Curated annotation (Swiss-Prot):
Catalysed reactions listed for this entry: sn-glycerol 3-phosphate + NAD(+) = dihydroxyacetone phosphate + NADH + H(+); sn-glycerol 3-phosphate + NADP(+) = dihydroxyacetone phosphate + NADPH + H(+)
Source organism per UniProt: Lacticaseibacillus casei (strain BL23)
Name recorded for this polypeptide: Glycerol-3-phosphate dehydrogenase [NAD(P)+]
Taxonomy of the source species: Bacteria, Bacillati, Bacillota, Bacilli, Lactobacillales
Functional pathway: Membrane lipid metabolism; glycerophospholipid metabolism
Cellular component GO terms, alphabetical: cytosol
Gene assigned in the entry: gpsA
Length: 351
């Protein structure tokens, strides 16, 4: 039975997910806030700016700049916009859902964002829950894991996690996406999935910088492993399940983001390692680099939670204090010795 789905955000990931859901037989509206982009996509049946000329939109996929049209009778609303746009888009969605109230079952809200809101330090599901009251929606599901849009576009095998406080909702979303190249597992640890998704972008900037500086595999492996320790520490302090961080949304997403040229965060770090300045890097990228803003949020969270995050702090110094990368690397290596696993540290224990 086809499901009516609204995908909000026509960047690379939103477009690919909308295409996949259409392939799976669902009725999908892909919304963009940019009418010119919509007109071009309708004319060319492509999203060349984000995905190149080889990627073709499914004929049945409907692209629109009319948010009300996209949301009309939608059983599922999938947010695939940058973290800094989540709240504003949700605020546009809210009055439309209020007008639709009583016309049928409330929609399931799904998001695929990988970041934290600046200022509030909220996870994305928290932002959505703050804007969209319970009486307007069934609940919230997050999908996350090791995934680049470019690979999914060519039907490379990909596995993600669908996480929700309500397992039945996660299972419903799981069924929508599953096919012979795209597989979802379910999880109820929303905190862990969202923290892993957001903070791995910070570590990926560091991994890219190491590559740009010419460091080898040993160094990169050390950064990723100790970076995962930092992500786990802050996640567990916030109430996440430790096992989540060795799953798809933890170590899985960390690996793909820290090793792939498709990763915007890795590419940004690589450019910094080669000597480019951050404003120039962001301008040349032409797309959102979530890890830059997330670094600032994570730096503040570490202090508020009293969690040791030396790698995150080092990346913060490079991005926001113009510290030389080689200097912060030396400072990291000169820290006093400590055990690899500090199980007596309160930040490693679930509250």
């Amino acid at each position: 039975m086809p499901t009516k789905i609204a995908v909000l955000g026509a960047g690379s990931w939103g477009t690919v997910l909308a295409n996949l859901l259409t392939e799976n037989g669902h009725e999908v509206d892909l919304w963009s806030h940019n009418p010119d982009q919509v007109a071009l996509m309708k004319r060319t049946h492509q999203n060349e700016h984000y995905l190149g000329a080889e990627f073709t939109l499914q004929p049945a996929l409907h692209v629109t700049a009319d948010l009300g049209q996209a949301l009309d009778q939608a059983a599922v609303i999938l947010f695939v916009v940058p973290t800094n746009a989540i709240r504003s888009v949700a605020e546009q969605v809210k009055p439309i859902l209020q007008a639709h109230k009583g016309r049928g079952e409330q929609p399931i809200i799904v998001h695929a964002a990988k970041g934290l809101e600046r200022g509030s330090e909220l996870r994305i599901s928290q932002v959505l829950a703050e804007v969209l009251p319970k009486e307007l929606i069934q609940g919230i599901v997050v999908i996350s894991g090791p995934s680049h849009a470019e690979d999914v576009a060519t039907h490379d095998i990909t596995t993600l996690t669908a996480a929700s406080d309500d397992l039945k909702l996660a299972e419903k979303v799981q069924k929508l996406f599953m096919n012979d190249y795209f597989r979802l597992y379910t999880n109820t640890d929303v905190i862990g999935v969202e923290i892993g998704a957001a903070l791995k972008n910070v570590i990926a900037i560091g991994a890219g910088a190491l590559h740009g500086l010419g460091y080898g595999d040993n160094t990169k492996a050390a950064l990723m492993t100790r970076g995962l320790a930092e992500i786990s520490r802050v996640g567990v302090k916030l109430g996440a399940e430790p096992l989540t961080f060795i799953g798809l949304s933890g170590v899985g997403d960390l690996i793909v983001t820290c090793t792939s040229v498709h990763s915007r965060n890795w590419r940004a770090g690589n450019a910094l390692g080669q000597g480019e300045k951050l404003p120039d890097v962001l301008k040349n990228m032409g797309m959102v680099v979530e890890g830059v803003s997330t670094t600032k949020v994570a730096h503040q969270m570490a202090r508020e939670l009293d969690v040791d995050m030396p790698i995150t702090d080092a990346i913060y110094q490079v991005l926001y204090e113009n510290a030389p990368i080689r200097t912060v690397i030396t400072d990291l290596m000169k820290r006093s010795g400590k055990p690899e696993f500090d199980f007596d540290n309160a930040s490693l224990q679930k509250p």
